[in-house]
Amino acid sequence: MVEAQSWTTRRMSNPRFDAAATAAPTIVDIPGTPPHSSASSPLKPFFLSSPTVSPTILTAAIIAAWFGSNIGVLLLNKYLLFYYGFRYPIFLTMTHMLSCAAYSSAVINIAGIVPRQHILSRRQFLKILSLSAIFCLSVVCGNTSLRYIPVSFNQAIGATTPFFTAVFSFLITCKTESTEVYLALLPVVSGIVLASNSEPSFHLFGFLICVASTAGRALKSVVQGIILTSESEKLHSMNLLLYMAPMAACILLPFTLYIEGNVLRVLIEKARTDPLIIFLLAGNATVAYLVNLTNFLVTKHTSALTLQVLGNGKAAVAAGVSVLIFRNPVTVMGIAGFGVTIMGVVLYSEARKRSKLLNQK
């Protein structure tokens, strides 16, 4: 639980980073796009189909935007919740959800990037609501971990998502994978054990809550694959975000009022003396939405496999950038552990791909 507290802005020329952290970006998994009729809009953005831009340049720009938004939201979250002194991770997560709801509505209803889909039944509504609850748990835990562990360690923990996905898939659906797939998970786990034992800024609570965030992302992925299976209930990723975001904001509201009850008063008082906080929160919330938008665009212009490969690279890049900017201490063993985990994730992806090909024959 994160207690409400008064504002404390840290002004240090060379701060120590023994309690730094970061969180996974606010993001939803991309399900398969159901069949639908194409939609057009006079405001449809140029980045979806621009005859004047080379496809190669367009794809490169989208990938660059994807990297920028994913790493940017991590660094902004870290700066706000630790260095700037904004100690309200639940409220921050709620602003992310409100931003995603507003931007999703504009992008779908006005810009027409994808056709609007509607919730067709009470059962479908309850399914999306359950996903929103898991979504909240994952993101709030990730944001809370900002205050305790560094970005690099957070990304190492986040890379273990395939392990938790395999565990939940077995526990919930009794689905088993090939021996090769399970063996590939060994370096995923052993790498994070190695990194944890040699992490200079290790914090037990930060570690546990970051693990909870990673497990929550995996659980959401598995549950989403189970409850949104029928063609009539499948939603495009952008439509799913459109409905999940406001539900998540409503779920978070009572928690932020109870746990962080003085956040609005503190925010108003702070804004009077330092208006920068308003721009930081607005920018942070916007970048949080851009993570989801660029996720969709990368998949549209490349493939889901490309997105998976980029995700593996993003963890390493984000960790490196955070060390350069915030200069949190790292060790050779910690770097080696992170590398082993990333290698395990790559091996896991390849093993699953081969397993699927064998099952299709």
From Swiss-Prot:
Residues 89-196 form the EamA domain. The keyword Signal does not apply. The chain crosses the membrane at residues 56-76, 90-110, 125-145, 153-173, 192-212, 240-260, 276-296, 306-326, 329-349. Its main location: membrane. The modification N-acetylvaline is found at V2. It is a multi-pass membrane protein. Keywords: Acetylation, Membrane, Sugar transport, Transmembrane, Transmembrane helix, Transport. One of its GO terms (cellular component) is membrane. It is found in: Membrane. Belongs to the TPT transporter family. TPT (TC 2.A.7.9) subfamily. PANTHER family: SOLUTE CARRIER FAMILY 35 (PTHR11132). This is Probable sugar phosphate/phosphate translocator At1g12500.
